Amino acid sequence: MTMTDPIADMLTRVRNANRAYHDRVVMPHSKIKTHIAEILQQEGYILGWHVEDPAEGAVGRTLIVDLKYGPNRERSIAGVKRISKPGLRVYAKSTNLPKVLGGLGVAIISTSSGLLTDRQAGKRRVGGEVLAYVW
């Protein structure tokens, strides 16, 4: 069975692992998931990520995301929300980019310049598809 929304699957895996205080999340690899993980690392929501080649007998590479917690196991990710979905795409112009919690969170936007945060897209004056909010 094919996956309808791999981005929502990734965000759900990260959200669930974060709520269960897991140290890492394993998921199927794709380029867009790698770019989302890169943005999450740049913004300080995760410790890091890496891609592993398939084990013998396994199909496809896996993306492993290392989650980040505070000194007393406080979660660095308070919430994640998928905005643009396969059934309802959401786009934003460069003049109308969303702010997540007044700038405390980050919006991940797919632009012609690649995946960018709302701040990066605003500086470059490009709009695009609003994939998700993270706070």
From Swiss-Prot:
BP-aspect Gene Ontology terms: translation
Pfam families annotated for this entry? Ribosomal_S8
Its recorded name reads Small ribosomal subunit protein uS8
**Record GO cellular component, one term:** ribosome
Family under the similarity heading: Belongs to the universal ribosomal protein uS8 family.
Q: Which residues form the signal peptide?
A: none
- Which UniProt key words apply to this protein? Ribonucleoprotein, Ribosomal protein, RNA-binding, rRNA-binding
Q: Which residues cross the membrane?
A: none
Gene Ontology molecular function = rRNA binding; structural constituent of ribosome
Subunit comment: Part of the 30S ribosomal subunit. Contacts proteins S5 and S12.
